[in-house]
Amino acid sequence: MVNGVLLLHKPVGMTSHDCVMKIRKLLKTKKVGHTGTLDPEVSGVLPICVGRATKIVEYLTEKSKTYDAEITLGFSTTTEDQTGETVETKPVNHDIDKADVEKVLNSLKGKQEQIPPMYSAVKVNGKKLYEYARAGIEVERPKRMITIEDIALTTEIKHHGETASFRFTVTCSKGTYVRTLAVMIGEKLGYPAHMSHLIRTASGDFSLDECFTFDELEAQAQSGTVEEHTVPIERALNHLPKWIISDTLAKKVENGALLETPEQFSEMTSGDRIAVFTESGTCLAIYFPHPAKKGLLKPAKVLMQKSEQ
């Protein structure tokens, strides 16, 4: 049984759910889940949790994402990307330069509000926005706070008749729509715009050069070497503070017991999480401050129980 994180190089044309279903069939297990939706037309890093690792999906989903994006100035679309129908056009002047673009990109760094596109899976009143959009109904969309950690121009500006395009890289918080970011960039430059290409190059610490294609995963499955190529749960959680405990405490953790907060974690707040490890290096659980009992830690997830060892 595989227990870990598969780093998939998601191909264009598949939904994230399609990828999960294919891996379930490939590995003959239902315990498979992805860690952050990628639109069908977007390729790149898609971490897939398998086996016990499905318990840590939420902790990987929270990580920042990095994208390589292309924006086309000159016309906007219904979907904010290259798949939609044209909404507005405006010929692009050839005097737009790198300095203009870099100034706009730098202005986007930090926290800001973003309204998700109508063609998205965000739910309003229990229904996905794209379902409203396909029915020709526009609804009020909830604003969300996002963080642009870094953004930079990576190519020259290329002019194509009445349009222009350039590429940029962006590292952003979960839930950021790069399509919408492209539209914002266009607005700040004075032009209708859309995202014409997107690839996710990193998800947290996982990069594209670590990922495997479906063909490679199928070959690993046939040779019985999938486990050798998965990221262990312990590495996947290396962004969390680590607490190494004694074998005596480990037995309590396996049973989901409350633990006294050690001195080094006395400043933890309610939103903090720590990964609890055995002396031999196995991650047993994730703990957080007990909401009602000061000085105690409560298990958020028990990853390894005695029966599984």
From Swiss-Prot:
As recorded in UniProt, coiled-coil segments are: none
| Catalytic reaction annotation | uridine(55) in tRNA = pseudouridine(55) in tRNA
| Gene Ontology biological process terms from the UniProt entry | mRNA pseudouridine synthesis; tRNA modification; tRNA pseudouridine synthesis
Its annotated function is as follows:
Responsible for synthesis of pseudouridine from uracil-55 in the psi GC loop of transfer RNAs.
User: What EC number(s) has UniProt assigned to this enzyme?
Assistant: 5.4.99.25
Q: Which InterPro entries match?
A: PsdUridine_synth_cat_dom_sf (IPR020103), PsdUridine_synth_N (IPR002501), tRNA_psdUridine_synth_TruB (IPR014780), TruB_C (IPR032819)
State what protein this is by name. Answer: tRNA pseudouridine synthase B
**Molecular-function GO term, any one:** RNA binding
In which organism is this protein found? Bacillus subtilis (strain 168)
